Regions:
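Conserved beta-strand hairpin/beta-sheet module of binuclear metal-dependent hydrolase folds
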Residues: 1-49
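Core dinuclear metal-dependent hydrolase active-site scaffold
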Residues: 18, 117-134
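Structural motif
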Residues: 25-27, 55, 125
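Short glycine- and Lys/Arg-enriched binding-loop motifs that mark or flank ligand-binding interfaces
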Residues: 28, 64, 129-130
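Active-site HxH/HxHxD metal-binding segment of metal-dependent hydrolases
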Residues: 34-123
Length: 134
């Protein structure tokens, strides 16, 4: 059985999700945790639930969805997974942040691209990647 935990992070009110199964495996989706307090909220939940994050997934790479990528990648030794069309958006993160008047560092962790119709396995469950640009 899959469970979803939602967090609302950063000044943009971005939704971050932790999807986890009965085996305590977790996927972190769009980690928008910007402050240390938000990072602690996320890691405290993961620790309290005794979860093991296995995947960092970005639905897209707008700044509010990737503020926590470096933190999650470093903390849990995970690569960021996203569609290759989002690489240019991620590369422009510092510029986009400056336009909004927020400070952030470029993402420096590993990247793994996901493709249209790719299957992501997660315990007994699997998900099909659907490209929904726009």
């Amino acid at each position: 059985m899959l469970t979803i935990q939602e967090f609302c992070f950063n000044a943009f009110q971005e939704n971050t999700y932790i999807l986890y199964n009965e085996h305590k495996e977790a996927i972190i989706i769009d980690p928008g945790c910007y402050t240390r307090m938000e990072q602690k909220m996320l890691t405290d939940f993961i620790s309290t639930q005794q979860l093991t994050p296995t995947l960092l997934l970005n639905t897209h790479c707008h700044l509010d969805h990737v503020f926590g990528n470096n933190f999650i990648s470093t903390t849990y030794q995970l690569a960021a997974h996203f569609h290759p069309n989002e690489q240019i958006v991620l590369d422009r993160l510092p510029e986009a942040a400056a336009k909004w008047g927020v400070a952030t560092e470029p993402y420096i962790g590993p990247v793994q691209y996901i493709q249209q119709n790719e299957i992501i396995s997660f315990g007994k469950d699997s998900f099909k990647v659907l490209l929904t640009p726009g």
